[in-house]
């Protein structure tokens, strides 16, 4: 017994010395021994709910998510009838504008990350007698892309190409937009302020008119709240409440003297100082033998992550006697059509080196580039949802289906029956001068931007007319499609609209009408030519040869005269938007005639711009048809509203103006072209020059290349800069990810006047991808995407990724740069001076990567120098994401 007592005492003693661990939320207790616990009362019971119901209470528990989901007012201002079309009434950066609210700050204190769906609502306090239309616009990650935002907001076409919604006073008093969080940051960093939701803009789409006088104002309110809130990880650091990145950049530019007078004027005017369709995935580890055996990078799409469906319908070949190899219903061949088609060769080197520079113009086949990555099969995976949607936004049908603002006209009570209010050429080449007085810079739509880079077009075009009216306006319009009639100068006589396909719109029941104009032509294809081009003239008639590129006109006429009650305005504004139909297709990709422009869009005096727009859109001259037509029979009547942007990208299109069904037909490609273009991913695989005539003149010097850099658009009226297909389509998107392929052709010249010859010595190609001293020493010498410098020995001999290439054997210097990036997506920013700064790299504006090309030869400025040109195209794992606007354009210099 005595022995047992000693054992028990020893056991109790060990219990007292044992470490006890307990986790209470964010606090972890570790203590030694037993922790006594007691209660204040012998038996604790919960009070009856009947007892608690005697006072105010509710069943729900208020969490942080509940508080953040409560809408708050972020702005209340006046919309005046003096505010012209395109004026920006309000803008706000998120989540900064929410965090500036004391309640939001209190609830978010103590956390590092915030991720949520942003909901913005705009309300107006309008009267039934007022008419006008507002546009709510959104740009993701806008604070980090100020130069892109400037391009977007220069034109109404650019704004309308972004995610937008309209507020029409005659049918409602509020609109709402739900915005998912899409950013290179998985969470908004509440402590550092990194990773933004983006910016919203409230813009005048149609001028406010108030009663007969046409003057007045209404109050608008902007609400915002968060849904699906996810806050992450506790911290004791304070929440960032400073200025957003674009404000910082403005301050820095002012401090350095780089802020221009024009930018200051815009800053003052816009008051920015105040305030289940397509799922396509990249293949992993594509092998040469699979490509040879199956004519596809993948055996049976076994390498693709999940699945592949497409809005572009698989063709029914019908009575085509022989089917070309590229027309196939196999998923592997469909993947090729969408651009997953040009893998880097991973077979034996000797198999293809006799044609090292082959297939530079092709989107498919094989690429011979040396991989600069550690793995010879390096390739990132593309998954759905990285940009907030499962759609493949590089599918051309997605791009073409986006409605863009195109034109506007006025319908007055004085316009009598048969007055022609508006004509428009049926062509996808929707590119026009900025105004009646500024004719050397151009506005554009998504459809026109694509047509600008092709030879042929065919397919339907969608027209939408939005009537800015009140409930006290009435009248009818006749909208006709007249094939192969253009105008009184080119065409003979007056068209008999009683024989045409038409839609009749009753203003009492419709605020907008949308319809599809089918492709009508005697040839399978028409040319992509701007209808106003000078070479379409013949016999002193402008546009006499227009029938080669335009299928006819859409004409809007008065059927029943506009009637306005005495207490409403005597005219209405009609807005026209255009987009591509379900079968709109292009063929023969080529160089664009017009390129993005970032320069001034005004004359010497910017105050003339309002007068220019008034002149462009005015409808003061009556254009009447004197010949009366017989009784009119409408083919289609009713209220056919516009298909919203999101639904249009899912393949939904409005009814046709006639009765036949519009569908895809692959025969025109099979019979006339020999290939089918369905994706921008195909187009950007074509190599193009991005650095030309670069010269090494100092012994020991090397070329330094920033492979991912895209320079800002030209600011001059005579553009001479190089554009690859990648560069051209870069301006349509907010984000990108993936590898880049670079090819260099180098020639030597022994003295002035001697012929050039291909280099016959080896080259050392090195990749620097770490933001450390060596990288900093290289980037500090760069002022463009391609520059030259003498590499210090300490830089080149420290083990960077190196390839030794002999062009006498391989033809070209060809390398592929991996997407070594800090985040899963990269914002599509542009750099004014060509090369990002170290701060740009730290922000994630570009993957940190510089290539150096060093010749194994002696160089002399007078006796032996080297001239090189650089070409690039994205790798097979590359994707653009989040469709945005189209930039203003300028014609390419050809003198």
From Swiss-Prot:
GO cellular component terms attached to this protein's record: host cell cytoplasm; viral capsid
Top-level taxon: Viruses
Pfam family, one: Rhv
Stated name of the protein: Structural polyprotein
Site annotation Cleavage: residues: 283-284, 340-341, 635-636
Alphabetical UniProt keywords: Capsid protein, Host cytoplasm, Virion
Disulphide bridges, residue numbers: none
Residue stretches in coiled coil: none
Post-translational modification: Specific enzymatic cleavages in vivo yield mature proteins.
Biological role: Capsid protein 1, together with capsid proteins 2 and 3, form an icosahedral capsid protecting the viral RNA genome. The icosahedral capsid has a pseudo-T=3 symmetry with a diameter of approximately 300 Angstroms, and is composed of 60 copies of each CP1, CP2, and CP3. CP1 is situated at the 12 fivefold axes, whereas CP2 and CP3 are located at the quasi-sixfold axes. All these proteins contain a beta-sheet structure called beta-barrel jelly roll. Capsid protein 4 is a tstructural component of the icosahedral capsid protecting the genomic RNA. It may play an important role in capsid assembly.
GO molecular function (one): structural molecule activity
Protein family according to the UniProt entry: Belongs to the picornaviruses polyprotein family.
InterPro entries in the record: Dicistrovirus_capsid-polyPr_C (IPR014872), Picornavirus_capsid (IPR001676), Rhv-like (IPR033703), Viral_coat (IPR029053), VP4_dicistrovir (IPR024343)
